[in-house]
Amino acid sequence: MIDIKYNGDRITISGEYIDIKAVFDCGQFFRYFPDDECDYIIARDKLLFVKNTDEALEIYPSSREEFESFWYPFLRLDMSYLDTETEFLRDDVLKKTVPVCRGMRILHQDEFETLISFIISANNNIKRIKKIIESICAAAGKKRQVGKKLYYSFPTPQTLSSLTEAQLLECGAGYRAPYIAKTANAVKDGFDLNCIYDMSYDSAKKHLCTLMGVGPKVADCILLFSYNKFEAFPVDTWVKKILKDYYAFEPKTNDEAVRFAIEKFGGNAGIAQQYLFHYIRTQSSLQK
């Protein structure tokens, strides 16, 4: 049971542990900034300081109204992970991830920001992804300030579509520059991102894959981290290796891997992927 306490512009969340590193530094989100004074995140046009204290998460500055309308759904505080982790304990492999991944949760991120961020993520590393995103935000976002922190909002489809491919290349986007430009223009011109909430997983994936720069893996990331379609199972070389080494399953295609995961983990396939992925990244290998 999540417990929320308000103290001016500071909010304390307890009752179910939320670990800053496990949530914001696990590959689902790219605007997390460790800081000597206090770590902070930027989502859409908002900056939030985040701090773990004992078994709680403290966040600030936020009004109660902003928290309830934006940060509460962003952090998916309506969802408990206790039952999910109980299910994972029944799996011989997943049960090893639960203690390490305690405090993780899937975020509900802005649809357009997630779309562009994961187009940038293709064949890329996290350090470079973050650098490209910040460059694009500086080029097309709005300059803002919270306390002493200056930052840029994530561009809207309208402002991002105003950047030329040459300008996107200057931001470090590389071969992804035309994908970003064309997709931003498509959304600006009416490509519907909201209808995805009402689609089945398969239909939503096909819909996203009509956009330039969106293949099956990128689509699954968007569906999982923005639309909370938890059956989405992003597949890369790490995930294929996990399935082969620990589940004795060697998929010939990404689609085979997704179907295996849905059969194995059901509606929690995407959450299972994040637990496995985070565990391998932090522990190097699962102890058999």
Give residue ranges: language-model regions:
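HhH-family (HhH-GPD) DNA N-glycosylase catalytic core used in base-excision repair
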Residues: 1-288
